[in-house]
């Protein structure tokens, strides 16, 4: 009887329609295992994975004094259970967590001290190990972070405690991320010699000249950073949003192609260029004189009026350490207002030592330039590139104020 049941299951799973229904409910990692069973299963698994285009977010926080023994297992199971095969992971952790050693789960009791030591890992090393090899890890640590629960019902701001925030993005056709790292000291030397860092940055950029750059995310782990870098990026990538801030540490899985260092943790500045014709990026600055939830809502209303499709969007919040609870007198003010106004859009970010960004608020329907774009003019006649003629054109335009203190930058990305 038992053998008959097993045989029946084998027969049933040879029916493509039923196999497809079963595989549709499996996470991506299990789908990859099933794809090796036979040619039919391989084709079905491939089709199922191609149809999955939704992003996934993850947040975990620990109060002071809580034990971290289970965090490594939580991270590993989160990646294991992802329905998508992630192409990019944006991750922010508090510096308190970055400095911790996590205990890795094991079935065996380690008696030898050396073996026990091998079962410890930093959060950055652990995530590198469990991510698919093709997934880009773009991460940083700071004194505070912002994260959204998997069900999108709650966004939390954490300052001075242990917390981790992740956003897993699937591969989308024609949407690409290019990273390049900048040694700000080499840049400063170049400025001293030539009074221009344009040639230096152009040589470092990994973005092909024919790509349509919609945003450059800018993360620096040094308090000293020549402001000319940000403005040069604006000139290189005309009509692209520049957004980011100053963090404590950079974490990435990508080797630096222009440096002997194998990890960008040794670099001073990490730039992430987001490209794609169907990508729309908008940003808004919550200035230092905003003190109430009602005022925050009025500012975010400008972002809401851009009419980006919320369910196909994600957003970043780059805030000053001086904001948050200390500024408003209560927790989660800005993130709660965002959650109220954009209930279908995940939000993540950090509290840093300085913010980078500007108002870029074109409406989505017609892409017409809006007067709220901080004097930043668009030129719809051609795409972004680093070609000399294009850069010279960008240098003639008035540039917005890019560097801020005691503000919050909200940057929203949509794939339409």
Predicted regions, residues:
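Cofactor- and metal-binding active-site motifs of prokaryotic enzymes
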Residues: 2-315, 320-416
């Amino acid at each position: 009887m038992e053998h008959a049941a097993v045989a029946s299951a084998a027969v049933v799973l040879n029916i493509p329609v039923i196999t497809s229904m079963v595989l549709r409910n499996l996470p991506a990692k299990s789908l990859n295992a099933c794809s090796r069973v036979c040619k039919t299963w391989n084709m079905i698994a491939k089709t199922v994975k191609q149809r999955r285009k939704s992003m996934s977010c993850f947040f975990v926080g620990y109060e002071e004094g809580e034990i971290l023994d289970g965090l490594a297992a939580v991270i590993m199971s989160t990646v294991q259970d992802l329905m998508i095969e992630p192409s990019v992971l944006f991750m922010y952790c508090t510096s308190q967590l970055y400095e911790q050693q996590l205990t890795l789960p094991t079935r065996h009791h380690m008696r030898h001290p050396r073996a026990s030591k091998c079962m410890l890992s930093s959060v950055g090393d652990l995530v590198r190990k469990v991510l698919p090899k093709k997934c880009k890890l773009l991460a940083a640590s700071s004194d505070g972070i912002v994260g959204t629960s998997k069900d999108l019902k709650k966004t939390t701001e954490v300052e001075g405690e242990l917390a981790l925030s992740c956003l897993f993005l699937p591969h989308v056709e024609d949407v690409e991320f290019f990273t390049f790292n900048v040694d700000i000291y080499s840049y400063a030397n170049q400025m001293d010699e030539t009074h221009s860092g344009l040639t230096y940055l152009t040589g470092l950029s990994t973005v092909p000249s024919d790509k349509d750059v919609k945003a450059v995310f800018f993360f620096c782990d040094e308090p000293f950073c020549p402001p000319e870098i940000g403005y040069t990026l604006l000139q290189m990538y005309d009509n692209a949003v520049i957004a980011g801030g100053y963090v404590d540490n950079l974490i990435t899985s990508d080797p630096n192609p222009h440096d002997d260092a194998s990890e960008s943790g040794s670099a001073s500045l990490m730039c992430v260029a987001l490209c794609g014709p169907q990508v729309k990026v908008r940003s808004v600055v919550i200035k230092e004189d905003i003190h109430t939830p009602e005022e925050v809502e009025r500012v975010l209303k400008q972002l809401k009026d851009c009419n980006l499709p919320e369910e196909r969007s994600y957003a970043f919040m780059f805030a000053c350490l001086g904001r948050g609870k200390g500024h408003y007198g209560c927790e989660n003010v800005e993130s709660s207002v965002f959650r109220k106004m954009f209930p279908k859009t995940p939000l993540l970010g950090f509290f840093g030592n300085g913010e980078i960004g500007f108002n870029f608020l074109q409406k989505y329907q017609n892409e017409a330039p809006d007067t709220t774009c901080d004097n930043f003019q668009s030129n719809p006649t051609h795409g972004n590139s680093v070609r000399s003629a294009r850069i010279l054109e960008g240098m003639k335009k008035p540039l917005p104020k890019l560097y801020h203190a005691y503000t919050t930058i909200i940057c929203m990305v949509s794939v339409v």
